[in-house]
């Protein structure tokens, strides 16, 4: 299972989010059809850009609770002091990817920033 964790500023466009996801996949040598889901914080439940990007990529959006983000936050590789102050986790993208991919997940692509979107990839043996 491959999950793209996404973080973004409010009203980030679907093309910007999709570009970040595709760049993370390319950096990892993966095609778009390897992706099983996009994960983000539950506070982004109404973010149209994320929903549209997921639809274009043919995957579901997994909303991750604050508690799940915090639990996965210990396994992140990168750190943004700004994001930590706002959300309580060092990287929303990395924590969301890890949380959605499951307890045995590992990061295969740390947080990548493209414009106002960030994307990280996590992999696990879990079924999507």
Summary of predicted features, one role per range:
Residues 1-36, 40-42, 122-128:
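Conserved mixed alpha/beta catalytic, RNA-binding, or beta-rich assembly cores of soluble enzyme
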Residues 23, 52, 94-98:
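Alpha-helical scaffold segments in soluble metabolic enzymes
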Residues 94-97, 101-128:
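C-terminal edge-of-domain segments
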